[in-house]
Swiss-Prot record:
GO terms for cellular component: adherens junction; apical junction complex; apical part of cell; apical plasma membrane; cell-cell junction; cytoplasm; extracellular region; focal adhesion. InterPro entries: ConA-like_dom_sf, EGF-like_Ca-bd_dom, EGF-like_CS, EGF-like_dom, EGF-type_Asp/Asn_hydroxyl_site, EGF_Ca-bd_CS, Growth_fac_rcpt_cys_sf, Laminin_G. It holds the Pfam family Laminin_G_2. SMART domains: EGF, EGF_CA, LamG. Glycans are attached at N41, N560, N656, N756, N879, N967, N974, N999, N1189, N1242, N1264. This is Protein crumbs homolog 1. It comes from Mus musculus (Mouse). Disulfide bonds join C34-C45, C39-C54, C55-C66, C73-C84, C78-C95, C97-C106, C113-C124, C118-C133, C135-C144, C151-C162, C156-C171, C173-C182, C189-C200, C194-C209, C211-C220, C227-C238, C232-C247, C249-C258, C265-C276, C270-C285, C287-C297, C304-C315, C309-C324, C326-C335, C342-C353, C347-C382, C384-C393, C400-C411, C405-C420, C422-C437, C444-C455, C449-C468, C470-C479, C641-C669, C675-C686, C680-C695, C697-C706, C850-C884, C890-C901, C895-C910, C912-C921, C927-C938, C932-C947, C1095-C1136, C1142-C1153, C1147-C1162, C1164-C1173, C1180-C1190, C1185-C1199, C1201-C1210, C1217-C1228, C1222-C1237, C1239-C1248, C1258-C1273, C1267-C1282, C1284-C1293, C1300-C1311, C1305-C1320, C1322-C1331. The keyword Signal applies. Residues 30-67, 69-107, 109-145, 147-183, 185-221, 223-259, 261-298, 300-336, 338-394, 396-438, 440-480, 671-707, 886-922, 923-959, 1138-1174, 1176-1211, 1213-1249, 1254-1294, 1296-1332 form the EGF-like domain. One of its GO terms (biological process) is retina layer formation. It is linked to Defects in Crb1 are a cause of focal retinal dysplasia and degeneration associated with a shortening of inner and outer segments. Affected mice produce a secreted truncated protein that lacks the single transmembrane and the intracellular domain, and develop irregularities at the outer limiting membrane and loss of photoreceptor cells.
Amino acid sequence: MKLKRTAYLLFLYLSSSLLICIKNSFCNKNNTRCLSGPCQNNSTCKHFPQDNNCCLDTANNLDKDCEDLKDPCFSSPCQGIATCVKIPGEGNFLCQCPPGYSGLNCETATNSCGGNLCQHGGTCRKDPEHPVCICPPGYAGRFCETDHNECASSPCHNGAMCQDGINGYSCFCVPGYQGRHCDLEVDECVSDPCKNEAVCLNEIGRYTCVCPQEFSGVNCELEIDECRSQPCLHGATCQDAPGGYSCDCAPGFLGEHCELSVNECESQPCLHGGLCVDGRNSYHCDCTGSGFTGMHCESLIPLCWSKPCHNDATCEDTVDSYICHCRPGYTGALCETDINECSSNPCQFWGECVELSSEGLYGNTAGLPSSFSYVGASGYVCICQPGFTGIHCEEDVDECLLHPCLNGGTCENLPGNYACHCPFDDTSRTFYGGENCSEILLGCTHHQCLNNGKCIPHFQNGQHGFTCQCLSGYAGPLCETVTTLSFGSNGFLWVTSGSHTGIGPECNISLRFHTVQPNALLLIRGNKDVSMKLELLNGCVHLSIEVWNQLKVLLSISHNTSDGEWHFVEVTIAETLTLALVGGSCKEKCTTKSSVPVENHQSICALQDSFLGGLPMGTANNSVSVLNIYNVPSTPSFVGCLQDIRFDLNHITLENVSSGLSSNVKAGCLGKDWCESQPCQNRGRCINLWQGYQCECDRPYTGSNCLKEYVAGRFGQDDSTGYAAFSVNDNYGQNFSLSMFVRTRQPLGLLLALENSTYQYVSVWLEHGSLALQTPGSPKFMVNFFLSDGNVHLISLRIKPNEIELYQSSQNLGFISVPTWTIRRGDVIFIGGLPDREKTEVYGGFFKGCVQDVRLNSQTLEFFPNSTNNAYDDPILVNVTQGCPGDNTCKSNPCHNGGVCHSLWDDFSCSCPTNTAGRACEQVQWCQLSPCPPTAECQLLPQGFECIANAVFSGLSREILFRSNGNITRELTNITFAFRTHDTNVMILHAEKEPEFLNISIQDARLFFQLRSGNSFYTLHLMGSQLVNDGTWHQVTFSMIDPVAQTSRWQMEVNDQTPFVISEVATGSLNFLKDNTDIYVGDQSVDNPKGLQGCLSTIEIGGIYLSYFENLHGFPGKPQEEQFLKVSTNMVLTGCLPSNACHSSPCLHGGNCEDSYSSYRCACLSGWSGTHCEINIDECFSSPCIHGNCSDGVAAYHCRCEPGYTGVNCEVDVDNCKSHQCANGATCVPEAHGYSCLCFGNFTGRFCRHSRLPSTVCGNEKRNFTCYNGGSCSMFQEDWQCMCWPGFTGEWCEEDINECASDPCINGGLCRDLVNRFLCICDVAFAGERCELDLADDRLLGIFTAVGSGTLALFFILLLAGVASLIASNKRATQGTYSPSGQEKAGPRVEMWIRMPPPALERLI
């Protein structure tokens, strides 16, 4: 269907294209009408079919006879960009001149560059006679109005297309050429595309391969196969060869093409009168009637006719006997013996082996067929036990695939079986058990597990029961036995050999312990020959074995276990000795092994005594605790808890140890966390000692609970001077440390000096608030750490041989290299100063602040010792007081402006009023009072404030007048401001007081400065070198080079770009502006009646601002003495944008952005509106389409007319019946979307071209009815029924199926229901079977544009012939886009064809 429709459309398209092509071909021929030369004035004659007048002379603007001028403006008499206007009825013209020009033809210039005279960015320059436009590259003409056509010189070669650009051009090459001018031919043969030694011929845009004889293809890549024509006969094999072939004949044939058959009967192979019959590469002997048999009739009829062989064996006659060939599974001379294949027991997992030759088992044995056959009697089958499968029952059936386990049980597959692991249901608190977890376990309903033991129920032999899973520290069937023991001081537990069972192949000792002791005995076991000891040394577990008092084994695990947590240790003695620390925080290297130090490891495991926690007390040399019997030295006894002690899996408890064999051991863990009450104060760290605690105090605290604090020494109280001196009472050698806490706010002063009577070892002092350190002969070492901040700092000196390191807390501040010296008894440590004031002043004077907890190594040097046991004698204290109080710094009332003083340690702070600031409230914070309008920024000045803002000038704004307030005393030697504008000539500032004056302006887009001042007779001029009318900000400063001189040259700085512009002459300063001089900002210039149009910052003259805001009502006045006051009363518009708002291109869709400095405005192109030209004006808003749908465009609209209407606005009614196709006398009825045919007589169809389908009477005498619409009568399931034509349904085929019910037409198409089909009437913008093709899609256009005209014409002729043939062969009435012929083979009623033949093709409409 689609093929024929496509062919039909293609036929129409190609026909119209061909006609157009033929028409255009003939239209270009010259006509003989021009042969007479009727045209005058050198004009050209060209024939037009619709007009006999044929003269064309557009170049000379002549009429059709080339005699008179048609348009007086045709020759462009107006010069430049002037506009020529034709005067009606006079044949004359008038020139409308642009600004700056006059005259009849606008040829006279008025020497003015105004009005944007130069186009395309050209720069206008004044000339003595007329303005001159300097054009940018790519443009020419007097006003730069002409785009220079770089393509005029035809720079592109070889048929390339030249595209003109701005100051350049681009060449688009045709295929086969490249390069900027398309002058380089592409050699397509460079890539060697031709294969198999073919010759490559380079051509324009392509290449051609000349192939050898035996190859073909575009690139000669295909070898020619001579065998393709199948030259070899009678099944011969063709062998392809270069340039030829050969035939390998099948047996029985010969010849070049195997065309000759060989006669195998020529040798007369048949004996005894047998008839030879020739075949294809064979023969056979017909022995009929000869009394012989065999291939050549050579054998008498055989003895096997008596069938001597058993079990369906095959009999073979010999010369005087026969041979039986047995079937598989049988043996013997007559095949009478059945081979027993089950003798090797091939079936696994108790499978039963059954031989296939057991004929009696067939029909009643699973796994065997119902009947016996000798063909399958060889072998065996395995009948598997339940749970197994496979040929040999080798595969275990996964019973878990059937999910036998209930209630969430987990199934485990077993050989031939399965096991269910039943869960505990946390929701219902129910245990399940039984084979399939179907039983609710009741054993724990009234369980007796003690001490939080977990009850585990079970169901065995139909009985419910339970077991108890005990927590650590408990054992027994009901967890009733306590296995936790608490060991006090000197406690022990003696386990005799009778307390536990005998030995096995290995022995195992395990226990859990809980202690804070770093050193303790856990276990000792053995005798005088061999002993094993398990102990804690420095918190780590150690295991040692001694043999005859010699240490043989020492194992240890480097992990701290003296942390008050539970730890599990296990010792195993077998072939190797293993020590393991299990669980807890030990993550790696928690197991260590060694060989057993004795030949028989069971000698260590022998039944012998063991001691847990300690040994019975005895005394030996040096008061060491020993085992009295064997005199074994021991570590301190264990204080803590042992739990779950097992000797060879036997629990050791107090109950199974004899009375009197333990001391200070109790059941349970009675340890107390002494640190729980946090007894250590002032950040002290508490250490739990099981029977007490110990506090490690942070400096400067001490005492058992860190409650005491070393008394600080106060130096320089109320600005006094003093020091402290300590005499060293021991020899400390070359390695020692000296540390102290220091608090100060003073940036200078001696902190520490260490010396003897003749030599000063080291001195430490404050310099600019940081520490400095020096030794004799070495440079000063300054530390990058600020100490004088009033905080407490721990300072430490660590003296080593040849080096001193300085620390602040744990931070290393650096080191210095020093000679080695030794601290001896009698040396003196000075703190805070020296007895000699002059020596002290060398280090910035005496120290002011506090020093606390001075330590030499671990010895404390106390200023005020409270014990007579101090290792040092009383120090020398001069003006050193106890504690660390601060001076009363508020005594002198340091706060100004009503500030309130608050005393700090050796410092003060002021609570200042809201309008003041500074350490002493000496600064008034004017800007915090919000003195400026919202559009201005407040800037604090030394004596007041100023409101800073950027002013916006519109070109029509009034000038702003300023005057001095008469109090300016400073020298005015400079002026600074910033601006941005597009003006070329404009005045910025003007001030004048005869004979002195100041002008700052822009001339020819450059900054211009004029000044006459002081006693100078010269007017100073400065002209900038850069253009400043680009709309961006420019920062400008004019200043005297020598500001202290009476006259000086001036310089101009623009945007800090060097070199600066410097004047050639000198003049005075701007001091004349102090004397009531009027200063005008934004004034008009002489040659520009408009004022400044742009932005101007607040101008600064000599550091004094020209504020745009007078003292407004509601805002405080400015307190500074020196001011320039705004005299004019006009309001100044502020709020200039920091940059050109048009730089971001805010205007869309070609809109032109106009910078207004405080904002921007978009001038939109036709069809667009909105702030940014973002709104496409809806031309459809007025509903211009009368009978159609309106599609909005840009500044336009398009009407898509409803069927039956046409015209720009769909206003014209189309007569749809004008070209109707109604046949057979039918009447055309016009409709909105087309027309319909009212059929006459016995005709039907859309165009009434077909006869109505006949009716058939169906049934018998009892039951009869009529089948309409061509339906036929048929017997179906013993009843008469109507079999309907495609497109009809119902019991009597009376209902026409509505093919439009599925709404097949898309994109607004209208569906028309027809017989067995539908027709989509598409909107004008769509086409296709279902209106699915969008005609506006560019992909549907220009498919054939790339084909050459000559080739295309030939292709059209051939294609049209084929299409016409195809249409003729398929010509039939298939209206619309739905073909019933497709339904005939693939429609929903194809299943009826088995009962009724398909209709004739002519009647399927």
